[in-house]
Amino acid sequence: IHILCDAIRTPENIGMCFRVAESFGVEKIYLQENSPFDENRKVVKTARNTLHQIKCEFYGDFDEKLCILKELGYTIIGIEITDQSINIQDFNFTNHEKIVLLLGSERNGIKNTNFIDATIAIPMFGRNSSMNVIHSLAITLYEVTNQIGTENKRI
């Protein structure tokens, strides 16, 4: 599993992305080139020593990075509420060998859904219509590992 962060800017969210991803054995995280990273103390503090335990690659152009990942055979799955979103529990992750989970920015979500193979949504039962991007990532990674298993390997 790889994670592509689309313009996530909050240092705490970047740090928690690494912390949660490492907990589930994620192989690689892609960050936009101007994202805060190991020079930012809030990122370092929230990541809790996981920043260099996961491969990280910085990209410049979001659409170009999506196209490259698709050319490499990855299925791009956006974690986003759209009219076409599939309930996360109904999405079969086992049908996809190479997966990139796409996280949208805190304010605007995923800016371009044209290259996405699917969008998944997490059912919510309260009055709030959204949740923090990293909470969504944690729930999604739990569902992925629940479906595909891990057998103590990177996913």
How would you describe each model-predicted region?
Residues 113-155:
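Structured adenosyl-cofactor binding patch, chiefly the S-adenosyl-L-methionine
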Residues 16, 61, 79, 105, ...:
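Gly/Ser/Thr-rich helix-start
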